[in-house]
Amino acid sequence: MSNADSNPASVIGQTKDLLETVYKRILEHYGIHYQEKANMTKLLSQVNDVLGLTPNKQDRLNSLGLISAKILGNLNQVANGMNELRNQFGRGHGRGHTQEGAVVVPRRYANLAVGSASVLINFLTETVQRVDQCKASEQIDQDFGN
């Protein structure tokens, strides 16, 4: 965020790169293969699948499941929006001053990108911890014949 005032487009690009890194690390953690040049949407889809976060995996017979399905769908949109924001306004493609997309991005968009990504990353890492705890608990039950 220290660059948000002087170079918000760079912050947006770095935030998108961080999200992509988190997705890939989660997939690697679970031994899931991904295409090295897979787009953000595909990577997030794989992450959601391995963590059981797809909206269709939620129990829609109760209020929590219905609400979770909505929120998870919106999280996907946040991630997709981050990708679009970076592609349009980020510095990942080395735009010159006269090229399309070389507009000055207001700091508030860098703040939005970082804030949204932070929430998503925290949620994903907490979910990884929970999934790992559940798997460990299942292994303990199997070890003791439960």
Residue ranges of predicted features:
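Amphipathic alpha-helical interface elements
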Residues: 1-73, 77-80, 127-145
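Charge-enriched, short contiguous segments at helix-coil
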Residues: 68, 72-135
